């Protein structure tokens, strides 16, 4: 009985996908981005709101890119905050530094 329910939902999903694909192709051919009367056909279907959400996400991405362009100072500050909050990471970094120093000392002793 569950097989029938799954098959029905798969068929419905397939039909929805084919219909959506057809709409996308038609919109691409008709130039959806250029509404002639000022009201996009999608606005009636509620899809216009989705377009606005994408625009907002793009604006946020642009702001992030601007931060990256300004410099890496922000990234260094973020790392310091993380290390200071946990305390463990800073201790681990100190241990790694000690290992590096010891390795260097051993190399110099062997060279002499």
UniProtKB/Swiss-Prot annotation:
GO molecular function: histone binding
Protein name: Prothymosin alpha-B
GO-annotated cellular components: nucleus
A GO BP annotation: negative regulation of apoptotic process
Stretch list, region Disordered: 1-112
Lineage of the species this protein comes from: Eukaryota, Metazoa, Chordata, Craniata, Vertebrata
Pfam family, one: Prothymosin
Ranges annotated as biased composition (Acidic residues): 41-83, 92-101
Subcellular location: Nucleus
Similarity-based family: Belongs to the pro/parathymosin family.
Superkingdom in the source lineage: Eukaryota
InterPro entries xref list: Pro/parathymosin
